[in-house]
Amino acid sequence: MAAKMAFADKPNHFINFPLAQFSGFMGKYLKLQSQLVEMGLDCKLQKAPHVSITMLDIKADQYKQVEFAIQEILDDLAAYEGYIVFDKPHMLGRCLVLDVKGFEELHVDIVEILRKMGCTADQSREWIPHCTVAQFEEEKEINAMQFYYKLPFYLKHNNILTDSRLELVKIGSSKIDGFYCSELSVWCGERLCYKPPTPKFSDIFGYCCIEKIRGDLEIGDLPQDDEEAWAELSYHYQRNTYFFRYVHDNSIYFRIVCRMKGCMC
């Protein structure tokens, strides 16, 4: 009998796509909120505009799996390149929200990766991508409000690196300057800024380097067998995948060899 799929129906975290860094979007978003104020409506304005990509029920010791899942998505981000469209202001329960289109494939894939890594992701109810504008004390009818914005979602757009980020946020976290305080935040342009300095791992690293790299990382990050560790590092180095970036961030020795382009043993 197949195992029953677990859902995050009592979530404690979510994957967040923040929007406060996009000035074009924010100009229209704040104008929409000002209309609510001018109409004299009693509501709580959203101070950290965002799109929730998926909900999670996880523990703090699973943060690394979440980070690796996000990094794995970034390795294939070209598959999701296009535009995110915000339009059709309407009520969803007690909230005034914008419809959001363009994150559908990203949602499906990140949920799949998170589940493979042992994280409880997504909810049993249908995921409805939206961006909250304001919350009311009770359900209301809001008519005749207009909004449309088309946001480029690319690693690089017109020779400018993206401002997009994917973040892990604990539910109930505080908000500062339009952003949630996050447990981790990964810049979507990170992959373009991390490039292995040589075509092959063996061009600058030797087997003698493995133990020094392993010593900089957490227990279990690399296989204990040196040949297996070498094969894993070589694979990710030559493909510039998420584990290369993780080791580069966390191993001082690894960074020195990459910078010097030569083994330091």
From Swiss-Prot:
Cystine bridges: none
Name of a matching Pfam family: Corona_NS2A
Protein family per UniProt: Belongs to the coronaviruses ns2a protein family.
Organism: Rat coronavirus (strain 681) (RCV-SDAV)
Domain of life: Viruses
Protein's name in the database: Non-structural protein 2a
Gene3D superfamilies: Cyclic phosphodiesterase
